[in-house]
Amino acid sequence: MYQTRKIGVVGQGHVGAHVANSLLMQGIADELYLCDINEAKVTSEVQDLRDSLSFVPYNTKIVNCYDHYEELACCDVIVNAAGKVALAAGNRDGELFFTTDAARTFAKRIVDAGFDGIFVSISNPCDVVCTELWHLTGYDPKKIIGSGCGLDSARLRTEISKKVGVSPKSIDAYMIGEHGFSQLAAFKAATIAGKNLNELQAENPDKYAFDHMEVEELARKGGYVTYQGKQCTEYAVANSAARVCAAVLHNEHAVLSASTLMTGQSGEEGIFTSLPCVIGAEGVEEVYTLDLSEYELEGFHKSCQHIHDNIAQLDWWDTEAYDAK
């Protein structure tokens, strides 16, 4: 018997609305459940998507849940896109208090209603919100996936591609750590056709030599270049979230850079941050610890510390319970 694929999206701002549209256009879900505290906004988005049904691959059921979050409990995947983009104008940390407060209004309600699927969280600061979802609900951390550095890794591959003339799809390279200014490129582990970038640069410097720091910075700040011209980012992050949803629903066992709970990888634990993960129907199936240079390892620890520092700003957070986990 055919298994209906159901995806919920919490938050219908710039990003949440584009996530819903991307899922619809790619035919990833059979049913979409949209939530937002602004009833007029979510009603408009639902109507707009329904008006598109004649032009998309599959006939998708689109449900307006308003702020009735318990209605999402039937979903296989729930995307958390609650946020306020204006607060993140210069820094993703700008949404810290807004997004963590928002998560407190719905996360436990959804889990208590019987949700047994996968959370995909894209609200910023992504790693803090993911850690919070785990902390608030006691939910299986493998079933909480943050978009994290997934899009940043795509930006990194694009920038490397422009330097070396190889398709970004053929480049295996990752941004890791916090989804923010402290993230870093794991160049020591980056490969093309199974060969390390450093080896390729030594063999053919004319083609493969480039300034690693420059490329890392372009990947790190790519989202802000987009923001400067349109005061939001929407298409790429929406497609990145849809990619994670597809990996879950199709049980792909795909390797993607995502924010997941650290359980000792590279000496870090107790927070969510980005490393390459195997993602399938049960969520995060495996987390890869990369071979990092001393410089990269130090940067990874600093990046993780920034996440801890953000969590410390949340005065409602039960730090004793958090540390006990």
Language-model features: locations:
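Glycine-rich Rossmann-fold phosphate-binding loop(s) that bind the pyrophosphate
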Residues: Q12-G13
